[in-house]
Amino acid sequence: MKICIFGAGAIGGFVGAKLADAGAEVSMVARGAHLSEMKKNGLTLLEDGLDPKRITVRVAQDPLELGAQDYVFVTLKAHSVPYVAESMSPLFHDDTTIVSGVNGIPWWYFHKIGGELEGTRLSSVDPDNKQWDVFGPDRVLGCVVYPAAEVIKPGVIRHIEGNKFSLGEPNGEKSQRSQLLSEALRSAGLKAPVRKKIRDEIWVKLWGNLSFNPISALTYATLDVLCEDRDTRQVLRTMMLEAKEIGEKLGVNFPIDVEQRINGGAAVGSHKTSMLQDLELSRPLEIDAILGSVQELGQITKTPTPNIDTVLATVSYTHLTLPTNREV
């Protein structure tokens, strides 16, 4: 089984390192200083309670150097994927599976969902249908990523918490490809349940991303503060309730309620969301997949989203004022 990690940053590097350490045939696509360091000295993984592990993996900037793979984990920021989709083609053979591990509503959401919305395409996450046309939705295996990790310097990844990668076919079947990947991940010491309704799990994680992330970027507050302050908690609540109404219209079952989801965020403690970290580093913000997509789904289901619309407008302007986006 050949597994490629396309985007060997924090999460991609973590799962790739765990798989490689367990004996899987892993390659990675990376760039810059991170790529150079991994080529020279391998990838170092730091985990609490364990000695640092230096893992040698095949790594390249050009996917053509790596050849066709059985599984390709896409672990980039969602907004980056359409721009590199065509460059992934050398990694595919006829039966290659794409493991979609990005945040938010995935581009393939309406593939094999059934009903009148079957095959609907989402411009907020797949402008110009680039992923749908280049990848093809039949290749996709859904994945909800739970671990938190960070690249503390080129070639070194620190695992923070979590070890679950939930998998699921768009049509809900327990396929051979999902079972084989689940076994590989479990052999690497990770949790990898195969879900019949992966979209339900996508929405529960999205609840946190669509509210915690932008509000933290607007306030510079950590999760514990956001969830415990009366006023910011109310903003989180109203956004989640709007999203819940959309999800339920699409057939999603939410196994927990809004208060439980917010309390779960509070329990993480004094943690900066990924969007706040990106803001502080002047990196592009992951807005469309976690907010724009929900706004688009609100329009599709004729569900008003006034609070989500307001937060989307304000955090989008914040994004435009980043040094990387300012006109010189």
Kindly give the residue locations of the regions a language model identified.
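Conserved small/polar residues in nucleotide/adenosyl-binding loops
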Residues: 318-324
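Interdomain hinge/lid region at the active-site interface
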Residues: 221-307
